[in-house]
Regions:
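Sec-dependent N-terminal signal peptides
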Residues: 4-14
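Sec/Tat signal peptide C-region and signal peptidase I cleavage site
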Residues: 14-20
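N-terminal (or domain-start) structured segment
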Residues: 20-110, 148, 172-199, 208, ...
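An extracytoplasmic/periplasmic, membrane-proximal ligand-sensing/linker region
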Residues: 25-27, 169-171, 236, 258-319
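A ligand-binding cleft/hinge motif common to bilobed small-molecule-binding domains
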Residues: 93-102, 168-170, 197-231
């Protein structure tokens, strides 16, 4: 019996390796759950183009939008786990379990995490010039007069909202959330001085920072941005446990063979090392971020748990 089991295990391993070696033998779909032209869409197209060149097979980017990015994710979660339907998503996919009452998938269980594409550092932005010369100054002002400081978001439970709440709770101050329909409107209100601060990825904010219309007080990622290296992290600014990462990453349906998951990881990693891809990702505000499938799966699971705790502490209820 022991020999039979050993032979079966060997055959299973050989089959998995053969499947991975044969993959891909037909076009692969890369599902983007948001609109064309977004950072997520651009990143998907840059990497998909390189994967096509590396593997000699077409990687077709499809935008399946709606419901805050959950429709595209649900489509992939329910797709055949054969490696031919890939999802690229963002930090938002780890927030959904805390903010959606009837989520059509389980982020931690319905996906095989492959690897991050990039980290996208979020900046704490204020109008320039501002009465708040530093993040510590902003927090001090908020504590001195509770309720006097407000911040913009693009909707309750969005990544910018969660980032602001992470900072607010760790620093211990009160602030009023003002939701807007989109990032351009939110930034306009900050530039006009009608809103005190706003969290935004470097890519979106950099032109206004360089033009002197906005000032970056800090970055909430664990490391400084290479695009704006003089801007301190929120930890460096003196606020422990205030870091919050924005990232973009790749996923497959949960039961995809591990050899295929590993093959895709290795090919994405290779693609990200190509000079053209590096340059394009950097131009879109992406910072290098690499994890193995196992590391990324663990990271995603911890992020889901952290966001649930954060939403509860901030009084954000599933809708």
């Amino acid at each position: 019996m022991g020999r039979i089991l050993a032979v079966l295990a060997l055959l299973a391993g050989m089959h998995g390796a053969a499947v991975a070696q044969a993959w891909p033998n037909k076009p692969v779909r890369v599902i983007v759950p948001v609109t064309a032209g977004s950072a997520l869409d651009i990143t998907a197209r840059v990497i998909a183009e390189r994967l096509s060149a590396q593997l000699g097979q077409t990687f077709v980017v499809e935008n399946r939008t709606g419901a805050g990015g959950t429709i595209g994710a649900a489509f992939v979660a329910k797709s055949d786990p054969d490696g031919y339907t890939i999802l690229i998503h963002s930090t938002a996919v780890t927030i959904f379990p805390a903010t959606f009452a009837n989520l059509p998938f389980d982020t931690a269980r319905d996906f095989a995490a492959v690897t991050p594409a990039v980290s996208v550092p979020p900046l704490v932005l204020v109008v320039s010039p501002s009465r708040h010369k530093s993040l510590k100054g902003l927090v001090t002002a908020a504590k001195a007069k509770p309720g006097s400081v407000n911040y913009a978001t693009v909707g309750a439970g969005a990544a910018a909202h969660m980032t602001a709440e992470r900072l607010r709770l760790s620093a211990g101050f009160e602030a009023q959330q003002i939701p807007f329909r989109g990032a351009p409107e939110a930034q306009t209100e900050v530039v006009a001085g009608r809103v005190d601060f706003f969290f935004s990825p470097v890519l979106v904010a950099q032109p206004l920072v360089q033009a002197g219309q906005l000032a970056a007080l800090a970055v909430s990622s664990s490391r400084r941005s290479t695009v704006l290296p003089d801007v301190p992290t929120t930890i460096e600014a003196g606020f422990a446990n205030s870091e919050y990462e924005f990232w973009l990453g790749f996923f497959l349906p949960a039961k995809t063979p591990r050899d295929v998951v590993e093959r895709l990881y290795q090919e994405i990693r290779k693609a990200k090392e190509h000079p053209d891809v590096k340059a394009k990702l950097a131009a879109s505000g992406g910072e290098p971020m690499d994890m193995t499938p196992g590391e990324f799966q663990d990271y995603v699971g911890k992020a889901v748990a952290m966001n649930r705790e954060l939403a509860k502490a901030a009084g954000i209820t599933p809708q």
